[in-house]
């Protein structure tokens, strides 16, 4: 078995390294100290095709694999863990929650391109004050109302949250089934009743 990187993988690795050294590294400490997120860096990642690396081209991905994606995340995270986490949340957690779910082709074509290509941030809404790694403590509930759902609950420690336009939100849909009824909903930032609360001053990864 050949464990060497192929030419395409080496090219992506070098592209990520060069971008990181030139554009990410110069102000990384300032961003961490001020807890500021540079959206332009994320847009650069979109322009280079990094955000959609592992997804099919029909959903504006690059049609490559997770090795290529991991190499890009690794190079960026070496210098700026916050940007690396932001990148991986948008790609793996937001994008993956849609791509590997029961989302329809119409939904994928509506909600993948804005985050993978157009520079809009995506977030993953799972963690709550009572539920994180243990999702059985989840309280957020989605009640069906005709053709729509009304979601009540709150999430915390949501990477990209303050600036995201799209959120994959996890919620219970049946009180009796509990965690077995958890479903994924895409919530757009301008949805009526949706608000973003105060930001926590975390120990690390402060500018994500």
Across the structure, where does each feature detected by a protein language model lie?
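Residue-level signal for inorganic ion chemistry
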Residues: 9, 20, 72, 104, ...
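Internal helix-loop-helix
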Residues: 47-121, 160-166, 178
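Short Gly/Pro-enriched turn/cap motifs at secondary-structure boundaries
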Residues: 130-133, 157-160, 174-176, 201-207
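Hydrophobic, small-residue-rich alpha-helical packing segments that form membrane-like cores
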Residues: 133-134, 149
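Flexible, small-/acidic-enriched active-site or ligand-binding loops
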Residues: 137, 190-208
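A structural signal for short hydrophobic beta-strand segments in well-ordered beta-sheet cores
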Residues: 140-143
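A short core secondary-structure module
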Residues: 148, 152-197
């Amino acid at each position: 078995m050949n464990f060497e990187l192929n030419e395409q993988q080496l090219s992506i690795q070098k592209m990520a390294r060069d971008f990181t050294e030139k554009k990410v590294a110069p102000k990384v400490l300032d961003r961490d100290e001020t807890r500021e997120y540079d959206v332009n860096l994320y847009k650069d990642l979109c322009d280079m095709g990094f955000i959609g690396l592992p997804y099919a081209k029909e959903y504006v991905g690059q049609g490559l694999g997770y090795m290529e994606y991991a190499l890009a995340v690794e190079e960026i995270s070496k210098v700026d863990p916050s940007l690396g986490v932001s990148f991986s949340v948008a790609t793996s957690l937001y994008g993956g929650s849609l791509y590997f779910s029961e989302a329809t082709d119409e939904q994928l074509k509506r909600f993948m391109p804005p985050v993978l290509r157009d520079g809009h941030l995506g977030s993953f809404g799972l963690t709550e004050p009572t539920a994180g790694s243990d999702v059985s403590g989840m309280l957020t509930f989605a009640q069906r109302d005709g053709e729509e759902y009304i979601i009540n609950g709150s999430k915390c420690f949501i990477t990209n949250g303050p600036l995201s336009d799209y959120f994959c939100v996890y919620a219970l849909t049946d009180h009796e089934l509990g965690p077995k009824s958890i479903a994924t909903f895409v919530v757009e930032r301008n949805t009526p009743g949706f608000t973003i609360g105060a930001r926590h001053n975390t120990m690390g990864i402060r500018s994500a």
